[in-house]
């Protein structure tokens, strides 16, 4: 049987469920931004590696404007 990667959305869901359990009843705040920030950085790292650091290629792969990509790379400390 071939090895299959878990669905990304399922991985996120499982981690969020664990996050809420770990809060132990404490009311969360800013979950949306937290999740986007946590997902965006590894996405950027992986795509930049796949593109050999070429921001123009990475922006096309991501469907982002090159300046938007550059801004995000700076925000995540990747430049």
Swiss-Prot record:
Molecular-function annotations in GO: sequence-specific DNA binding
Signal peptide residues on this chain, from the entry's feature table: none
Transmembrane segments: none
DNA-binding region in chain numbering: 55-74
GO BP terms: regulation of DNA-templated transcription
Gene3D superfamilies to which the protein is assigned, alphabetical: Homeodomain-like (1.10.10.60)
Keywords, ordered alphabetically: DNA-binding
Family classification: Belongs to the transcriptional regulatory Fis family.
Name of the protein this chain belongs to: Putative Fis-like DNA-binding protein
